[in-house]
UniProtKB/Swiss-Prot annotation:
Keywords: Chloroplast, Electron transport, Heme, Iron, Membrane, Metal-binding, Photosynthesis, Plastid, Signal, Thylakoid, Transmembrane, Transmembrane helix, Transport. This is Cytochrome f. It is found in: Plastid, Chloroplast thylakoid membrane. The chain crosses the membrane at residues 278-298. GO terms for biological process: photosynthesis. The 4 large subunits of the cytochrome b6-f complex are cytochrome b6, subunit IV (17 kDa polypeptide, petD), cytochrome f and the Rieske protein, while the 4 small subunits are PetG, PetL, PetM and PetN. The complex functions as a dimer. PANTHER family: CYTOCHROME F, PTHR33288. Its main location: plastid. Component of the cytochrome b6-f complex, which mediates electron transfer between photosystem II (PSII) and photosystem I (PSI), cyclic electron flow around PSI, and state transitions.
């Protein structure tokens, strides 16, 4: 128990340090959703990651058609995007995109322990830390942020439940929901915009000045109809879309949209198959096959008898 607590402390410490050292990855970290939402999937079916990642992008998931109880299988989440594209980091400099994903499994399904994973599956998941969403929801798995260039395909190792051990689980067809993002979010959980978003004017008026600010920011001064000068700061890394002398409206964009990423959802199904049903199907097909063979042999024997009688 003490060892487990120690590793948990180390993991949290490393995560916090990573958020400080690599701010461009911090606002995609699943901890934001984990802290704010007990369940990442809303009643409408929408996954809450879409609250911060506003653009829609494709996401695909692959799972076996059917699995046996108490067996390990994999769910492969595909997060397609152009690796040549770079995003605006928190510091305003261009950088590679990071990715993250969430897999919402039926209750009873959970993350497969390493001791149950094959060598091939261990190799596929090496360097990718998959964790349960929370202690109360072990059936929801999250990963990220991780560098997207090498992880456009993320493998989740999953352990299927055994109805013989868990009476709440049955041999049925179960849905699996998946969400995946590439790139930073446009909005922080607090509602504040990140610098991976379009910044708009807070007032209507005339642009009287555009000046370089601190740390790569840009100051835009707008003179309103009342003669009041309002100064707005466009974050570092964003390209200003207005020029001095322009007459603009309130909520008009002051910068171009820098976002190159986005979030996507997908869903699929998996059948928890009964071993007895599989054995029964095999026995049935075997019986049918043997019966057909016997019928063919009997038919040939009958034809030989008929031919012999005709010759006689």
């Amino acid at each position: 128990m003490q060892i487990s607590k120690f590793f948990k402390f180390v993991f949290i410490s490393v995560s916090l340090c990573g958020s400080l050292l690599f701010p461009q990855m911090a606002n995609a970290y699943p901890v934001f959703a984990q802290q704010a939402y007990d369940n990442p999937r809303e009643a409408t079916g929408r996954i809450v990651c879409a609250n911060c990642h506003l653009a829609q992008k494709p996401t695909e998931v692959e799972v076996p058609q059917a699995v046996l109880p108490d067996t390990v299988f994999e769910a492969v989440v595909n997060i397609p995007y152009d690796t040549k594209v770079q995003q605006v980091t928190a510091s305003g400099t261009p950088g590679p995109l990071n990715v993250g994903a969430v897999v919402i499994l039926p209750e009873g399904f959970k993350l497969a322990p390493k001791g149950r994973m094959s060598d091939e599956l261990k190799a596929k998941t090496k360097g990718v830390f998959v964790q349960p969403y929370s202690k109360t929801r072990p059936n929801i798995l999250v990963v990220g942020p991780i560098l997207g260039e090498k992880n456009r395909e993320v493998t989740f190792p999953i352990l299927a439940p055994d109805p013989a051990q868990d009476k709440s689980v049955h041999y049925l067809n179960y849905p699996i929901y998946v969400g995946a993002n590439r790139g930073r979010g446009q909005v922080y959980p607090s509602g504040e915009k990140s610098n991976n978003n379009t910044f708009t004017s807070t007032a209507a008026g005339k642009v009287t000045a555009i000046e370089a600010g601190d740390k790569g920011t840009t100051r835009v001064t707008i003179q309103t109809a009342a003669g009041e000068a309002k100064e707005q700061t466009v974050p570092a890394g964003l390209k200003v879309s207005v020029k001095t002398g322009d007459v603009i409206q309130a909520d008009q964009a002051l910068s171009y949209n820098p976002n190159v990423g986005g979030f996507g959802q997908a869903e699929t199904e998996v059948i928890l198959q009964s071993p007895n049903r599989v054995k029964g199907m095999i026995a049935f097909f075997f019986t049918v096959t043997v019966a057909q063979i016997l019928l063919v042999l009997k038919k040939k024997q009958f034809e030989k008898v008929q031919a012999a009688e005709m010759n006689f």
